[in-house]
Amino acid sequence: MRIVIYSMLVLLIAIQYPLWLGKGGWLKVYEMERQVELQEAKNSLLALRNAKLSGDVKDLKDGTRAIEERACVEHGLIKEGEFFVQILPADKSSDTQVTKQ
């Protein structure tokens, strides 16, 4: 009788091995689910960035206002008689910059 019990126990362990540690076992499935969650989080951040860039591209294609704003902010270009006021966040500097040309 003991031989039957021990052989059944060995067979039970042999059957459980692929379920837990095999190629498609629970541990691999759990790890893959975690990787999918991380990738979905990255994808959502990239989707937000893409939406912002898409809006920038649309603004640059449709009107000159976005081009003027970029020229002013990034390169300091302003028109004759125009004022450019840039308010910086408090953590960087509390001063305001005013330039007149």
Curated annotation (Swiss-Prot):
Top-level lineage group: Bacteria
Cytoplasmic-facing ranges: 1-3
A Pfam cross-reference name: DivIC
Compartments where located: Cell inner membrane
Keyword Lipoprotein applies: no
Bilayer topology annotation: Single-pass type II membrane protein
Known role: Essential cell division protein. May link together the upstream cell division proteins, which are predominantly cytoplasmic, with the downstream cell division proteins, which are predominantly periplasmic.
PANTHER family (alphabetical): CELL DIVISION PROTEIN FTSB
UniProt protein name: Cell division protein FtsB
Name of the gene this protein is made from: ftsB
